[in-house]
Amino acid sequence: GVGIGMVAQGFPWQKGDNVVLPADEHWNNTFPWLALREKGVDVRLVEPDSDERVTPESIARYVDKRTKIVACAAVRFNTGFRADLQKIGEIAHAHNALFLVDAIQCAGAIPMHVEKLGIDIMAAAAFKWLLGLPGSGFLYINEQARQIISPILPGMFAAENDFRELRYLDDARKYEPGTFAYPLFHAWRAGLDLLQEIGIDTIHTRFLTHT
């Protein structure tokens, strides 16, 4: 939620711009966008079909030249529906929009190749399949998106060590809001080491044998 909120508030919106996302997404991928209505942003909610699916075709009907971001969950929290990320990303990019993915329900369980899938921004908490603890998580943001989205809470690790001028680092660290929760990340490292030892592809294959 924090990562998505930073993106939503850091984008240079103009009145009349729009963001497209499926209706009834998790609150962490809904509230940050709904808050943009106060800035005159058109928040377009795509209704799921009768089978609770949100297809690329249904999303495409809401995307136009004023769409700046298309956001969706890789796997919906309330139904388990798995989105066709590659096709949705293609739709977003065809309209020069950024593609953001909420990956909390799949990161660590499903291979997520961001470049292959056309994902510009991806965020997830660590406490599900990533074997972390509540309060830890990640925000992936590619170079193109970094040129557009401004930091909203620059912390001590976001810029060069200068007391008189703010010179952001040229990678995703410029979005770091403050001091790390070191105990959480030390614990998370152990979980990530275990995931790497087993392999995400192995985990995914195992899941498919039970679903």
Where are these regions (language model features)?
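Pyridoxal 5′-phosphate
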Residues: 1-211
